[in-house]
Swiss-Prot record:
Pathway info: Purine metabolism; IMP biosynthesis via de novo pathway; N(1)-(5-phospho-D-ribosyl)glycinamide from 5-phospho-alpha-D-ribose 1-diphosphate: step 2/2
PANTHER family (alphabetical): PHOSPHORIBOSYLAMINE--GLYCINE LIGASE, PHOSPHORIBOSYLAMINE--GLYCINE LIGASE, CHLOROPLASTIC
Pfam families given in the database record: GARS_A (PF01071), GARS_C (PF02843), GARS_N (PF02844)
Annotated S-S bridges: none
Classification of source organism: Bacteria, Pseudomonadati, Pseudomonadota, Alphaproteobacteria, Hyphomicrobiales
Organism: Brucella melitensis biotype 1 (strain ATCC 23456 / CCUG 17765 / NCTC 10094 / 16M)
Protein name: Phosphoribosylamine--glycine ligase
GO biological-process terms attached to the record: 'de novo' IMP biosynthetic process; purine nucleobase biosynthetic process
Sequence similarity: Belongs to the GARS family.
Name of the gene encoding the protein in the UniProt record: purD
Cofactor: Mg(2+); Mn(2+)
């Protein structure tokens, strides 16, 4: 099969690496890609927002399957446009991608189909949002309705923080994404990311992960797209997975079909595991980044065969095989992230990681300049490891990371701390 992968981050490098291992693959292309992806795929210089060029490329190369990595082209309707041209594509329609594209849409769906989530209000002006916040009190959560690259959420511990967050949304901090605001109940518990692959009818669990949103050690500083992750999430016991499928995922699949937008693609539930069980924080309609990297490290099954089954509506015939070992990934980011990122610094000695057992390096915001790898984005490298325990995977990843010569890079030194503490307690 000839496959076109769309995207250029660490998530897409992990997908490319896994797709490239499939015996079904004849040729892999990636638009835009990065220097890490270039090792397993032929890169095409087409941006993810240039739908016409992507469609033309898919036709010219006789692509059998398109796999869309990031959320923005899905919310913008790329999958619909490709399907209309007779191209097989893995990813939800524009209507189904509203689960990620509009927080308000998802909250209304939860209300209609009795899916457990925090109480909420939707507002298109600041005075009404502020009145609701004053009525509810803090802590409370303020979210921009639309896509804001994972940065449109403020968990306000004080009333003033919440009111300021409303102002920044309506003053245009998130552009069109902040034209509507969702204010919701603060949920207490432990967060987990839970993934399913879906074909419109069937949802098949792809496992859980826990990511680390804040930029600094000890979960301090501003939110980011994610500074590291590990899988599986210990809080997602078999019983909790069964409850999540029964109480959240299956009603969502039924609800989306009922409103005429059946969901196919990756459904990523951001969960809060509370004393009452799992509650939905938000849905995303693609793999998480960096959660995808740890899921791919643990997946033994053929990813291309799996995606094919999803596109053809055959997931009810599929069973998956996983490594028993946990996986952990640490993000190396460029100085200044998540604010003003310094780009262009040279990264050396990446080849030293190739010989380390159980370690895989995924490229994210990297580029090739004059024969050298340079930082071209905020999150730049993902050092990923598997081992018998999370503590061992953590040690392995950090040991590998220290071989990289990149003074302008930084990372959190405590990725996986919750799971490591749990392992110590359970010894």
């Amino acid at each position: 099969m000839k496959v076109l992968l769309i995207g250029s981050g660490g998530r897409e490098h992990a997908l490319a690496w896994k797709l490239a291992a499939s015996p079904l693959l004849e040729k892999l292309y990636c638009a835009l890609g990065n220097p890490g992806i270039a090792a397993v795929a032929e890169l095409a210089d087409i941006g993810v927002d240039d739908h016409a060029a992507l469609i033309a490329f898919a036709k010219e190369k006789h692509i059998d399957l398109v796999v869309v990595g990031p959320e923005a082209p899905l919310v913008a309707g790329l999958a619909d446009e490709m399907r209309a041209e007779g191209i097989r594509v893995f990813g939800p329609s524009r209507a189904a991608a509203q689960l990620e594209g509009s927080k308000g849409f998802t909250k209304d769906l939860c209300a209609r189909f009795n899916i457990p989530t925090g109480a909420y209000g939707r507002f298109n002006n600041a005075p009404k949002a502020k009145a609701y916040i004053r009525q509810q009190g803090a802590p409370i959560v303020v979210k921009a309705d639309g896509l804001a690259a994972g940065k449109g959420v403020v968990v306000a511990m004080t009333l003033q923080e919440a009111l300021d967050a409303v102002d920044s949304c309506f003053e245009g901090a998130f552009g069109a994404a902040g034209a509507e605001v969702v204010v919701e109940e603060f949920l207490d518990g432990e967060e987990a990311s839970f993934f399913c692959i879906c074909d419109g009818k069937t949802a098949l669990p792809l496992g859980s992960a826990q990511d680390h949103k804040r930029v600094g050690d000890g979960d301090t500083g501003p939110n980011t797209g994610g500074m590291g992750a590990y899988a599986p999430a210990p809080v997602m016991t078999p019983e909790m997975v069964a409850r999540t499928m029964r109480e959240l995922i299956e009603p969502t699949m039924r609800g989306m079909a009922e409103i005429g937008a059946p969901f196919s693609g990756i459904l990523f539930a951001g969960l809060m595991i509370t004393s009452d069980g799992p509650k939905l924080i938000e849905y995303n309609t693609r793999f998480g980044d960096p959660e995808c990297q740890v899921l791919m490290m643990r997946l033994n099954s053929d990813l291309l065969a799996l995606v094919n089954a999803a596109v053809d509506g055959r997931l009810d015939e599929v069973s998956l095989e996983w490594k028993d070992e946990p996986a952990l990934t640490v993000v190396m980011a460029a100085e200044g992230y998540p604010a003003n990122v310094k780009k262009g610094s040279v990264i050396r000695d990446l080849e030293k990681l190739e010989s380390i057992d159980g370690v895989k390096l995924f490229h994210a915001g990297t580029a090739l300049k004059d024969g050298a790898i340079v930082a071209s984005g905020g999150r730049v490298l993902n050092i990923t490891a598997t081992a018998a325990t999370v503590a061992q995977a953590q040690a392995r990843a950090y040991e590998a990371l220290k071989l990289i010569d990149w003074p302008e890079g930084f990372y959190r030194s405590d990725i996986g701390w919750r799971a490591v503490e749990r392992e110590k307690a359970n010894r």
